């Protein structure tokens, strides 16, 4: 079945027809055919995508990507622990909100939504507060489309002996990284982002020695990261509670298609071409990105809304959807913007068609 329109969003996103077709069969969660041949293969493939070094493992968690973030924050940080988190967008702020809900002390570094974190501020906080045990940062902050400097951030954190948590929700699978070489202890992502699967579960790729320290620390039964991992380890892919079988099988197919494309490097190149084609085309129509080009990620781009008095996002959105494209509203608190994603089953030719559709949808310029 074909899609009526292309989702130009940061996920859920447009998937291939073969990924969707993979969900047309039912699976028994007790069978080796599911647990060993699908779940365990996924777990192994994820680790290999994240690092070429040994010592890492992976665990899948039911729910949204935020559920996996909360599972990590709530399991990795002990009762005497304290978190430092960078908040330069909605998703960094969400990590701080999770810490508040879980009564975890939290130091928030807030450089603003259009700025990268100032590493000297992070350095000062870590040097002056020995109670901080863990640090967290979002790799691609899709509030704006900014790519944060995770290598420098992790280097500062490791120099102070901290456990590093990376929210790579919207970047893993689309931007090459080696989490072992970066010193990342826990990396979190989701099925419905750059791997190009469908929603239903997230996953955590972790240094096994750090994950084992999580035993008995969870603040939630269903979000107990260690217990979920231990169950999968002992029972060869078995989930503690009902797993999203169709989503898991679709993700397996999506991983195969990532390999067929040429791996993360090839996908990153496609996403980059999409993004550069998008920005050039939008500028030709008079739109300007929110961020300077050096801060852009290949994942999603924020554009300033037109200042014309007749412009309304909903009307613009509707005209684009009628032409087969769905874009995203803005999420920046101090600027009127909208966002266009570059990821999913989207190619440069699609972006070129989008630019033509946007030109036709600019109703406020009609004389």
UniProtKB/Swiss-Prot annotation:
Biological process terms in GO annotation: organic phosphonate catabolic process
Modified residues (N6-(pyridoxal phosphate)lysine): 193
Domain of life: Bacteria
Alphabetized InterPro entries for the sequence: Aminotrans_V_dom (IPR000192), NH2EtPonate_pyrv_transaminase (IPR012703), PyrdxlP-dep_Trfase (IPR015424), PyrdxlP-dep_Trfase_major (IPR015421), PyrdxlP-dep_Trfase_small (IPR015422), SP_NH2Trfase/AEP_transaminase (IPR024169)
Cofactor: pyridoxal 5'-phosphate
MF annotations from Gene Ontology: 2-aminoethylphosphonate-pyruvate transaminase activity
Enzyme class: transferase
Enzyme Commission number(s) of this protein: 2.6.1.37
Record field: catalytic activity: (2-aminoethyl)phosphonate + pyruvate = phosphonoacetaldehyde + L-alanine
Keywords, in A-Z order: Aminotransferase, Pyridoxal phosphate, Pyruvate, Transferase
Family from the record: Belongs to the class-V pyridoxal-phosphate-dependent aminotransferase family. PhnW subfamily.
Protein role: Involved in phosphonate degradation.
Assembly mode: Homodimer.
The protein's name: 2-aminoethylphosphonate--pyruvate transaminase
Taxonomic source organism: Vibrio vulnificus (strain YJ016)
Gene: phnW
């Amino acid at each position: 079945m074909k899609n009526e329109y292309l989702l130009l969003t940061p996920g859920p996103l447009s998937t291939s027809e073969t990924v969707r077709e993979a969900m047309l069969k039912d699976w028994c969660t007790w069978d080796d055919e599911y647990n060993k041949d699908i779940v365990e293969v996924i777990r192994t493939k994820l680790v290999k995508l994240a690092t070429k070094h040994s010592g890492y493992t992976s665990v899948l968690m039911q729910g949204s990507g935020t559920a996996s973030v909360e599972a990590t924050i709530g399991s990795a940080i002990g009762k005497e622990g304290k978190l430092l988190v960078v908040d330069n967008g909605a998703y960094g702020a969400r990590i701080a909100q999770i810490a508040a809900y879980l009564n975890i002390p939290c130091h928030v570094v807030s450089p603003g939504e259009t700025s990268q974190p100032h590493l000297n501020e992070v350095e000062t906080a870590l040097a002056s507060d020995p109670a901080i045990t863990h640090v967290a940062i979002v790799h691609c902050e899709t509030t704006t489309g900014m790519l944060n400097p995770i290598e420098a951030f992790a280097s500062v954190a490791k120099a102070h002996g901290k456990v590093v948590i990376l929210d790579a929700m919207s970047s893993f699978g689309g931007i090459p990284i080696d989490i072992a070489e970066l010193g990342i202890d826990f990396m979190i992502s989701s099925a419905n982002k750059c791997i190009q699967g469908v929603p239903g579960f997230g996953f955590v790729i972790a240094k096994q020695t750090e994950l084992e320290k999580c035993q008995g620390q969870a603040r939630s039964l269903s979000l107990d990261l260690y217990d979920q991992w231990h169950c999968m380890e002992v029972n060869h892919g078995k989930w503690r509670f009902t797993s999203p079988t169709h989503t898991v099988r679709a993700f397996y197919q999506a991983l195969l298609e990532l390999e067929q494309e040429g791996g993360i490097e090839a996908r990153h190149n496609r996403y980059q071409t999409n993004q550069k084609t998008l920005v050039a085309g939008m500028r030709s129509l008079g739109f300007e990105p929110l961020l300077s080009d050096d801060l852009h990620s290949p994942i999603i781009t924020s554009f300033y809304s037109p200042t014309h008095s007749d412009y309304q996002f909903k009307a613009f959105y509707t005209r684009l959807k009628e032409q087969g494209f769905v874009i995203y509203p803005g999420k920046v608190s101090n600027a009127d913007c909208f966002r266009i994603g570059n990821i999913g089953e989207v190619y440069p030719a699609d972006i070129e068609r989008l630019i033509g559709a946007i030109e036709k949808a600019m109703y406020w310029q009609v004389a």
